[in-house]
């Protein structure tokens, strides 16, 4: 008999359905040579400080630091029934093997191992490692179970993280709370993130607005702008001088540019985009993606990869075809996917990028809750964008001299809309949601004429525009996630496996 332990009941039910296990018991299912049960999140956790010494019940400066040796573990009261069920199942004489089917990631590994050790189990165990809850993926995963020992390092890293969080959280929280006479929570990820927010708030508070002016010349239907001028009188004087002078092109160049499609979503990128477009918090996005994963409509969400493995090409082509037929904004679009640009096994870590699954073929999108449908559509749209052609344009930059001052005209001529055409179609369905962020002052003007060196314009029309410098924007969840992802990058070894503050999943907490 093989005992399969999932992370939660809904996942256990999906595994049972795929394996044909139908006989329901109290806290588990049985049939076809399988026992399938589940944890309820973290069944076994690191014990509270008071478990080590009675004196630790009271927060005091003299009791610090608290450094457990050896570490103790506990099962909280509300989870003891399910833990006992798992423990009894592990000890059944007909159980010869245990399968860790908790989420295929660091925390899932920790959840299983702590239960396994706390139950005193020494039976051999293997690892189910899948990126989709589709029946085909589950069956393939069980046919290719990995030896449990292959994930010993992952377990060690998870346990190290948990102990580090405990030591920092318990000791630093108690220290600062005692010193300041009120509860001040300190955390390994929480506190540096709070510092980012405080720094941004301080920058906004201390910001002093400055007004600047730009003189703009009409040169053959295009507009050439001066550098910033702080004094309004100087700007007006330059305007007057230009209108009595000649604007001469001193350099004009065009450059063919390709703007590559965006990469597929990892969790952090999905959270940022969902926050910017729909206002969802990072946790809401993770919860919605997890729900879609458990409904078999989305691949595993807790990933930091933005590519698919090389062997997923055919599957991705089929999914793209499904999306073209399912997503309303693709109606009438001319689209031939180039899936190859999304494939790179060398850039895939534990799990590939987030994409919809083949279950999309049977799904009634209209029947999904709106928030889940939004996330599924967002992930599907990103797959189509990523597989579309580059956005190709000629960028034109012309510099003019007028009244001993340089003016610059910039523009672009679009040659191939590529993925941006699909993005425009998608955004047109969002009903008032924000467009892509841009810098209004430096935005390229479409179809600027080509200028040649020496070309001149007599007495060009000129105008002065006034602008105010802008304070830093308050962090949104989207910008904060990006700041966390990039935190410390300049000081991190280029060969480091991971950078930034927290993991994609912990940033959602």
Question: What residue spans do the PLM features occupy?
Answer:
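Long, highly charged, low-complexity internal segments
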Residues: 35, 43-77, 88, 181-290, ...
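Acidic, turn-prone loop/beta-hairpin segments
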Residues: 337-367
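Hydrophobic (often cysteine-bearing) scaffold residues that line and stabilize catalytic clefts
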Residues: 11, 107-111, 156, 160, ...
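Intrinsically disordered, low-complexity regulatory segments
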Residues: 1-162, 166, 471
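Amphipathic alpha-helical segments of the small helical/lid subdomains adjacent to P-loop NTPase cores
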Residues: 157-187
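Extended, well-ordered alpha-helical scaffold/bundle regions in very large, multi-domain proteins
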Residues: 280-348, 509
